[in-house]
């Protein structure tokens, strides 16, 4: 390392101590936030490398600055690996985030004011799928589709009927809180039927898609976007895929010079490392274990009548639980669990009656605990600890028992081996 830990600590003790406290928190907490994961040391090394010094506006072979031969190699590695993972003809690895990837995708497919259909936030969609507080809802005329009120599943007949009525230029598929398999072929059929384009945001399930454990949207979507963290287990960032050469040109222009300047080549390098990890056969085993652990936790809640799992179960890395029979709301549940070192987030549920700041539900994800080595037995234990906490929220003796059990689990599965 150019700047080792001792030098860092001596130079900026305040910042060093803050980072050390966060490392301690991550080690001693059970992380269930579905959008978080644990990256490898190789990913962190790449992201902390000397590549952070280099400015490289443009794309490999077409840069505005000199001295880019090496970063061209780095970015090309990331591009080619992304294409191999997802079977796409074109990939842009420069987006700084999933939201910026989505912004560039919209710019490549539609014009401001065009009508777009996206999943309702309470049904499991994302802010960038048309929420009024997001650039997406402010720039385009978004009309939301929802899940069926009884099954809490996507109702493709209802979505088709709605599309025929509103005649969107674009349909957005994908979710941030939907626990079932999404049939992207049906979304493409609906888009074709009404003359719309299809964009898929697979940010949450990209790792499962990469492992062949969830149907891929790439053959069906005009543009597919994703983050590179979450189930993909890479650095925080975005990725855009397409099989259409003309759209690829528009995507590249939308990213640079459209909404970004120079790419973060140290982050691109970290993406390249994580993509190499995804191509390793061990990643498929990891992804399979994520789903097993998610199901194991969900099964514990399904056996308790005081809790309700949205849509009745899970087929991916996450699930939502209605907690209102046990505690006042999801925010209360989140705060109670924080006190026993279990981290998750409050989450709206379909046809939500409470505000987004309170919510009726919590969202539970298995990606991070699986990366630490938790198996189905440990996952069931985690679910039991959540239930125990929420049902004994004023019993300090019970809460202390939970803290001790959490400590046993986190000690048994360290965040990183020394």
From Swiss-Prot:
Its main location: cytoplasm. The record marks 229 as: Plays an important role in substrate specificity. It is an enzyme of class 2 (transferase). Belongs to the SHMT family. One of its GO terms (cellular component) is cytosol. This is Serine hydroxymethyltransferase. (6S)-5,6,7,8-tetrahydrofolate binds at residues 121, 125-127, 246, 355-357. Gene3D superfamilies: Aspartate Aminotransferase, domain 1, Type I PLP-dependent aspartate aminotransferase-like (Major domain). The modification N6-(pyridoxal phosphate)lysine is found at residue 230. It is found in: Cytoplasm. Its cofactor is pyridoxal 5'-phosphate. One of its GO terms (biological process) is tetrahydrofolate interconversion. Catalyzes the reversible interconversion of serine and glycine with tetrahydrofolate (THF) serving as the one-carbon carrier. This reaction serves as the major source of one-carbon groups required for the biosynthesis of purines, thymidylate, methionine, and other important biomolecules. Also exhibits THF-independent aldolase activity toward beta-hydroxyamino acids, producing glycine and aldehydes, via a retro-aldol mechanism. It holds the Pfam family SHMT. It comes from Streptococcus pneumoniae serotype 4 (strain ATCC BAA-334 / TIGR4).
């Amino acid at each position: 390392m150019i700047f080792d830990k001792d030098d860092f600590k001596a130079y900026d003790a305040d910042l060093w101590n803050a980072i050390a406290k966060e490392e301690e928190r991550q080690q001693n907490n059970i992380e269930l936030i579905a959008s978080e994961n644990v990256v490898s040391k190789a990913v962190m090394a790449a992201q902390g490398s000397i590549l952070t010094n280099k400015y490289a506006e443009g794309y490999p072979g077409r840069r505005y600055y000199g001295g880019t031969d090496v970063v061209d190699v780095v970015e090309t590695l990331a591009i080619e690996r992304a294409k191999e993972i997802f079977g796409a003809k074109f990939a842009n690895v420069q987006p700084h985030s999933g939201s910026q990837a989505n912004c560039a995708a919209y710019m490549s497919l539609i014009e401001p004011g065009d009508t777009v259909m996206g999943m309702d936030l309470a049904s499991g969609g994302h802010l960038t799928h048309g929420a009024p507080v997001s650039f997406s809802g402010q720039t385009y005329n978004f009309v939301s589709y929802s899940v069926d009120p009884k099954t809490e599943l996507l109702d493709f007949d209802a979505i088709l009927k709605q599309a025929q009525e509103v005649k969107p230029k674009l349909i957005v598929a994908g979710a941030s809180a939907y626990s079932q398999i999404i049939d992207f072929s049906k979304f493409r059929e609906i888009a074709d039927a009404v003359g719309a384009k299809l964009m898929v945001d697979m940010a949450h399930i990209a790792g499962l898609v990469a492992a062949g454990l969830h149907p891929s949207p790439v053959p069906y979507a005009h543009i597919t976007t994703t983050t590179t963290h979450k189930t993909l287990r890479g650095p925080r960032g975005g990725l855009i895929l397409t099989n259409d050469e003309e759209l690829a040109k528009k995507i590249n222009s939308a990213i640079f010079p459209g909404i970004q300047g120079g790419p973060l080549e140290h982050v691109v390098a970290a993406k390249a490392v994580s993509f190499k990890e995804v191509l390793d056969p061990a990643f498929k085993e990891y992804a399979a274990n994520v789903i097993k652990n998610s199901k194991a936790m969900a099964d514990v809640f399904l056996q308790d009548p005081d809790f309700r799992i949205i849509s009745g179960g899970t087929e991916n890395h996450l699930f939502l639980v209605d907690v209102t029979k046990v505690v006042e709301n999801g925010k209360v549940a989140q705060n109670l669990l924080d006190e026993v070192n279990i981290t998750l987030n409050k989450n709206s549920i379909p046809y939500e009656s409470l505000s987004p700041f309170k919510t009726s539900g919590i969202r539970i994800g298995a990606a991070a605990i699986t990366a630490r080595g938790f198996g189905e037995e440990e996952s069931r234990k985690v679910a039991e600890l959540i239930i125990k906490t929420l049902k004994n929220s004023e019993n300090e003796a019970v809460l202390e028992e939970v803290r001790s059990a959490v400590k046993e689990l986190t000690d048994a599965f360290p965040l990183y081996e020394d």
